[in-house]
């Protein structure tokens, strides 16, 4: 059973929890409720305690706020956050002075942090899917000597799984390099421009990776900008394959096809990933690698797809212009597009079921 809060701690918690905006700045600073040039506010949502402050302009989980306070050697906030319920062992991830180590030990911290706890912290931060969470994760985890081999291996597996097809598995990859690519991919996927700018300022060799992320996450406007204006280019068929990693990437598939990419290769890549929307869009554009696609489907155990690809019921969509290269025109063309050949196979499957 946790010990009761001291009167001083309870008062601070009450003040931090109030919605009143008229409390004087000097009073808040005197009470230790001022952090990163803003009032420190506390609230509870679904049983989790969050901190509002000026840090990154976002709400932060109390346990994550503790990690930041420890990294900053803000001893008063370390004590306060721990008294409010932060898990003191999380402090071990960012301790960088003997004084902080001694203080956290006095507050009950263990000598080492379990891999499971580290993994929980990582997922807790990344769960928010914001620019701030990416920047925060970078500040806590990049080149952190506290990361042990077991956790590093676990994190590698997570990254390879989430970036399947976008990143090549190499045992020689540095964990820090993988983390940066993972965070950058997240920033592109969810349009977190602040995080993209943050990573671009710190790392100058991400142009090709950015191009690949734009392809994978169907970002046609950004792709057009980097490909034509900044001249960051790779083989067009490799681009088309990257566009087929995720399903329903019609914009970037069309864009790469209009640049001269092989639509049959795109069709086969889509079969490999079982991306049905992509497969039939490729057929709409003239793809006809039916036998090869059926063979790949059979090898992967996609039995219905294997059978459906050898049916003599498909043809290209004559209503699709094949020479558009301006993102606005492509977006307008495909905004409400319904695949002709996907409709054909759906009608066929309804008849036989």
From Swiss-Prot:
Coiled-coil positions: none
Pfam family, one: ASFV_360
InterPro entries associated with the record: ASFV_MGF360
Taxonomy, superkingdom: Viruses
One record GO biological process: taxis
Described purpose of this protein according to its UniProt entry: Plays a role in virus cell tropism, and may be required for efficient virus replication in macrophages.
Family the entry assigns: Belongs to the asfivirus MGF 360 family.
Name of the featured protein: Protein MGF 360-13L
Species this protein is from: African swine fever virus (isolate Pig/Kenya/KEN-50/1950) (ASFV)
Organism phylogeny: Viruses, Varidnaviria, Bamfordvirae, Nucleocytoviricota, Pokkesviricetes
């Amino acid at each position: 059973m946790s010990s009761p809060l001291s009167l001083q701690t309870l008062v601070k918690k009450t003040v931090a929890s109030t919605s009143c905006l008229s409390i004087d700045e000097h009073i808040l600073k005197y009470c230790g409720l001022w952090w990163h040039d803003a009032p420190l506010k506390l609230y509870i949502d679904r049983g989790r305690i969050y901190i509002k402050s000026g840090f990154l302009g976002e709400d932060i989980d109390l346990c994550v706020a503790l990690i930041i306070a420890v990294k900053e050697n803000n001893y008063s906030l370390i004590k306060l956050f721990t008294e409010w319920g932060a898990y003191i062992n999380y402090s071990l991830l960012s301790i960088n002075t003997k004084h902080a180590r001694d203080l956290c030990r006095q507050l009950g911290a263990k000598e080492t942090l379990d891999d499971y706890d580290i993994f929980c912290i990582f997922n807790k931060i990344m769960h928010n899917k914001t620019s701030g969470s990416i920047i925060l994760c970078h500040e806590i985890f990049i080149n952190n000597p506290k990361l042990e081999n077991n956790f590093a291996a676990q994190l590698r597996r997570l990254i390879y799984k989430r970036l399947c097809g976008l990143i090549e598995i190499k045992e020689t990859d540095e964990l820090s390099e993988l983390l940066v690519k993972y965070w950058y991919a997240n920033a592109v996927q969810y349009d977190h421009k602040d995080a993209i700018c943050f990573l671009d300022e710190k790392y100058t060799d991400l142009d090709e990776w950015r191009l690949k992320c734009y392809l994978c996450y169907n970002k046609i406007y950004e792709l057009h900008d980097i490909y034509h204006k900044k001249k960051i280019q790779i083989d067009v068929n490799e681009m088309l394959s990257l566009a087929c990693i995720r399903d329903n990437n019609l914009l970037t598939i069309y864009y790469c096809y209009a640049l001269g990419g092989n639509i049959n290769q795109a069709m086969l890549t889509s079969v490999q990933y079982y991306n049905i929307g992509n497969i039939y869009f490729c057929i709409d554009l003239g793809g006809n690698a039916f036998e090869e696609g059926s063979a790949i489907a059979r090898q992967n155990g996609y039995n219905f797809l294997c059978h459906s690809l050898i049916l003599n019921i498909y043809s290209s969509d004559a209503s699709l212009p094949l020479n558009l290269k301006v993102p606005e025109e492509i977006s307008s063309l495909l905004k409400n597009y319904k695949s002709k050949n996907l409709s054909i196979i759906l009608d066929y499957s309804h008849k036989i079921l």
